């Protein structure tokens, strides 16, 4: 019994040493995040595309399928991420003005954003997976979720009533190949 406890403590020391060595080798103690492209479409099969500099969701067919916007993602925590389009040059943000909370596209480079800067929190979304679908909640405005309208060709927006069935808040989110 005494031998097992001795072996256990040596094993713990070894693991602590290895784990400490792993994190000391990186400047911030975590792996640098890289941008990845994802396809996104709602549970009603509407994809995102840009119309008049506004992100909308609709049914793209034929030659219009090339209009589909890929979502650029930079993970910042296990379940939080920045979302952008156009190679990360335009980012989705949650903006609150008075009683109004809205989604907007901002001309900001996604790789310049930092989870440690308070002003960048409006660009962060918390990803929640439920089976094959994903929802995105604003980190800056808790309770507000990325959504699409039931009708096609309407702006992608935010809702604080995800369970009312008025807006679609469940998406398929798949890494682009």
Swiss-Prot record:
It is found in: Secreted. Residues 1-25 form the signal peptide. Keywords: Disulfide bond, Glycoprotein, Secreted, Signal. InterPro entries: IL-1_CS, IL-1_fam, IL-1RA/IL-36, IL1/FGF. GO terms for cellular component: extracellular space. It comes from the Eukaryota. The keyword Secreted applies. PROSITE patterns: INTERLEUKIN_1 (PS00253). Its main location: secreted. Pfam families: IL1. GO terms for molecular function: cytokine activity; interleukin-1 receptor antagonist activity; interleukin-1 receptor binding. SUPFAM superfamilies: Cytokine. CDD domains: beta-trefoil_IL1RA. Glycans are attached at residue 109. One of its GO terms (biological process) is negative regulation of interleukin-1-mediated signaling pathway. Disulfide bonds join 91-141. PANTHER family: INTERLEUKIN-1 FAMILY MEMBER, INTERLEUKIN-1 RECEPTOR ANTAGONIST PROTEIN. Belongs to the IL-1 family. Anti-inflammatory antagonist of interleukin-1 family of proinflammatory cytokines such as interleukin-1beta/IL1B and interleukin-1alpha/IL1A. Protects from immune dysregulation and uncontrolled systemic inflammation triggered by IL1 for a range of innate stimulatory agents such as pathogens. This is Interleukin-1 receptor antagonist protein. The lineage of its organism: Eukaryota, Metazoa, Chordata, Craniata, Vertebrata. The gene is IL1RN.
């Amino acid at each position: 019994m005494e031998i097992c406890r001795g072996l256990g403590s040596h094993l713990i020391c070894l693991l602590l040493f290895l784990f400490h060595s792993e994190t000391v080798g990186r400047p911030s103690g975590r792996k640098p995040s890289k941008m990845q492209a994802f396809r996104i479409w709602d549970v009603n099969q509407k994809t995102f595309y840009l119309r008049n500099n506004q992100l909308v969701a609709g049914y793209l067919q034929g030659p219009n399928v090339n209009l589909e916007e890929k979502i650029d993602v930079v993970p910042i925590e296990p379940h939080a991420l920045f979302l952008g389009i156009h190679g990360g040059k335009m980012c989705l943000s949650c903006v609150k003005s008075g009683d109004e909370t809205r989604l907007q596209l901002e001309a900001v480079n996604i790789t310049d954003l930092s989870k440690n800067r308070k002003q960048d929190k409006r660009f962060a979304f918390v990803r929640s997976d439920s089976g094959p679908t994903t929802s995105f909640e604003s980190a800056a405005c808790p309770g507000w979720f990325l959504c699409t309208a039931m009708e096609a060709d309407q702006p992608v927006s935010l809702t604080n009533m995800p369970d009312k069935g008025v807006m679609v808040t469940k998406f398929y989110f798949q890494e682009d190949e």
